[in-house]
Amino acid sequence: MPANNTLPLTILADLTDTQIAEAARASGEPEWLVERREAAWRFFAESLPPIWKRTDLTKFRSENIAVPLGPQGTAVQWDAKLSEQGVVFTTLAAALHDHEALVRQYLGAAIDPLGHKFNALHAALWQDGVFLYVPKNVAVELPLQAIFTLADGSHSTFPHNLIIAERGASVTFVEEFTSQDAEDQILAAPATEIFVGDNATVRFVSAQTWGKGVYHIGAQRARLGRDGTIEWIGLNLGGQLQHIEAEATLEGNGSRIDWVAATFADGTQSLLTAPMVRHIGTNAESHLNFKTVVDDSGYSTFDGMVKIDHSGQGTNSRLEEHAIHLSSASRSDSIPGLQIDANDVKAGHASTSGQIEEEQLFYMLSRGIKRDDAIHMIVTGFFEPVLDRIPLEDLRERAAVLVEAKI
């Protein structure tokens, strides 16, 4: 979904809530959304930056970022026959006009627009993004995909994806953020909200393959109803800096999440992923398995948490993160955590980090495999369980190429 640079750009430091409101009204947005944007901007302007211990924003000059006031352009391609079943897959801007009641009901119902300064910035300035609605008991067989790119000259992007699967529905949604390398700093602040109805199933793939120079500060939230299931697949390979706060709330009894991700930080990349699962319903399950590779002076942080409320009796949860270091200068921090307020649960976490074992390399070298080839095989095999779950062959192959280029 390429950006359209015909829109006038405004430096973030010079922007006012009046300009934001005027641009929103000029785009035909309803007054309730205009008021939300104004409130979010005031919060952004008045609040201090969040204190993130492991995300260093000192080199990022957000005040110098130029932002477009209005949609940059979003194109959606899909099988129109799905509309006969009541499925809606369109731009979020179009959905505001055609399905305003649904958008108003769900927009901001998972992600708090005033959660912190960058959440508020997104809520004030979001443009582009898709709206996916699957009605009750409808199964969408083929994956639906949205690709967000940066055109030449773009300095920022704020897409918002809103995914709704009603009771008994099933769908696969794939989002990808990708671009060429940039000389200037680029701000990407996307957000994705997912609502999984009772007995519904969502497979969600999020691939971050930005080029150099991109600062990716994103939010992702999913809310699950009774017996709802989400398979969440994350891929974090690009950009200069990444800070993703991702959360799944298992509200319904018997709900389930299976969450895997692959992260590879090399060069001077700093990539942080902060997944959190909150168990509210009874007899819910969460299984998280994250894999990380760091090389050169790359830095990766896994800040994972499983919270089990007092109401979350019968929970079964497992949280794991495993990291491989390919250089002595690379670094990874793994911070898995459990917060348990229920007394009838099964929960555990595990974390490993280190260089490839010499015994493993020696075994491969003794069979005539060159050292570089052996390392390549180990890393690709390490990521394979994650990449194999990507449902689109094209994305799966491109991800494999990107991983190979980093080794």
What function would you assign to each model-found segment?
Residues 2-123, 135, 289:
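N-terminal amphipathic, basic helical "cap/leader" segment at the start of enzyme domains
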